[in-house]
């Protein structure tokens, strides 16, 4: 067993005595050794270790990517009632990661995670409600779950709320409420919120602040979002926006910018 800074647990009693600092110390240690340690704890039955190991297998952190093994560990954690495992099992079923896509099962896992208080579960369940994917479409219920997640500080949910007010879906159209929600999402680090907040700032003549937020978008945005945002910015009436849009497009991988 490779060296890790935290002694290897031998049984459930040892697992129960691990502190949050112990977990963080292992996570921050040498990736390969951390994977070995985490797998041992997962095999002892730790739902936390099962969820972390699943994520590492999904990402290829310290080990080869293996979506099927990742899914199996997420499912083990989920069946123990562990909310992170439930949410990730839902993501696997939604996105066909290591298993066949099944939006109905995904919605069930998200719903359980949401009812247990996980903000990411609330957000993912709301997304399915909004899209009518795996559940009957219900924007009112979707907005309710976005609000619950936003109350917990979930930035992506704040941005979603902004769109509801911007478009006037199940709530009266309210640009001030949309502006506030996009601002909350932007300050929370959501790149979509930053992009939309920048647009509304520009509409209000606050160009310097708009540009400052817009420059943050490429730092966290996915390549596909940078493509969409860059193309949109090239159509802007503001020269500075067009410049940032071109910079976004120039930074894309060649296969995405063809």
Where are these regions (language model features)?
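Short helix-capping/linker turns of helical repeat alpha-solenoids
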Residues: 30, 43-46, 59-61, 66, ...
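Terminal, low-structured helical/coil segments at or just beyond the last alpha-helical repeat
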Residues: 3-6, 219-258
């Amino acid at each position: 067993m490779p060296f890790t800074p935290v002694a290897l647990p031998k049984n459930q009693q040892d697992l129960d005595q691990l502190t949050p600092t112990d977990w963080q110390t292992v996570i921050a240690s040498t990736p390969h050794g951390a994977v070995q340690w985490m797998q041992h704890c997962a095999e002892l039955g730790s739902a936390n270790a099962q969820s972390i190991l699943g994520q590492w297998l999904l990402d290829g952190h310290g080990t080869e990517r293996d979506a099927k093994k990742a899914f199996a560990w997420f499912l083990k954690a989920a069946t123990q009632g562990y909310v992170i495992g439930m949410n990730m099992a839902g993501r696997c079923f939604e996105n066909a990661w290591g298993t066949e896509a099944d939006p109905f099962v995904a919605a069930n896992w998200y719903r359980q995670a949401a009812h247990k208080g996980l903000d990411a579960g609330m957000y993912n369940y709301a997304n399915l409600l909004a899209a009518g994917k795996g559940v009957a479409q219900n924007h009112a219920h979707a907005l309710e779950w976005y609000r619950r997640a936003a109350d917990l500080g979930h930035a992506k949910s704040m941005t979603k709320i902004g769109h509801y007010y911007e478009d006037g879906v199940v709530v009266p159209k309210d640009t001030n409420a949309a502006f506030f929600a996009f601002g909350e999402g932007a300050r929370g680090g959501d790149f979509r919120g930053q992009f939309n907040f920048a647009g509304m700032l520009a509409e209000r003549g606050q160009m310097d602040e708009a540009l400052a937020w817009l420059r943050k978008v490429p730092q966290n945005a996915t390549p596909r979002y940078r493509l969409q945002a860059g193309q949109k910015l090239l159509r802007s009436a503001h020269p500075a926006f067009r410049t940032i849009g071109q910079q976004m497009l120039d930074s894309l991988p060649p296969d995405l910018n063809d």
